[in-house]
């Protein structure tokens, strides 16, 4: 199964790489991570701090963003690209029809909604204001103290893919975003989402958005009529911890190879970037990549002047089983 995004010539001229992290998307996806215990290597310390500090009323916001399945589309308005104030302003201006539609979607999925959800679905001004207040408090608690780190990683990710665009054109950009994203002009195919769908942009263009809190697989809005965005996990510079699952992966692959597999899973990288990220010599990184490639966990391809390593479905399955 795959989501196939079909481009017209007009769409191809309107593919954009986001200029800055989107606080609304980071809020939504961090809510997902807060409700799981996966990816402790990257998010474990953050999760422990935020769970301790988050107030119960603000925690009700998480009911609109379950970690599996549908989350309310209205939580990530396109205006979030302009910053937190713009995003919350758009959230407060969400049409009543959109609020009702998205909350009905959650209810049909059997989600337990906050006590104020019915008022929100009716467009009650007090409930909408309450939603905006909770969202702002959530950002202040869960994201603001870490926002410089999010921005630094975003800038590095954007610089990397800007280089791929310059070296390999549109294919150089789209084919290096994530192992589950493939560009076969004029169709962008995204796998690993558990859905099968064809989306025709019809001149709307596409925003490509790296996300710090997006984990393992890309994500999309459910409603294909909204401004279209593909959100994908940005690369993380991580240090291995002593988490039980991670110790098992270390025992299976070895510490350095496990770290290389983790790094490559977040997006295509070069041998030099792997060497820098893992603290080993380029020749050593190249050797480990060769071993992982022979095991079917990684693949290597040339895009423009860059030779990129990406994780295979088998490699992702191994990591998913470990997470």
Question: What feature does the model see in each segment?
Answer:
Residues 1-190:
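N-terminal, charged low-complexity regulatory/assembly segments
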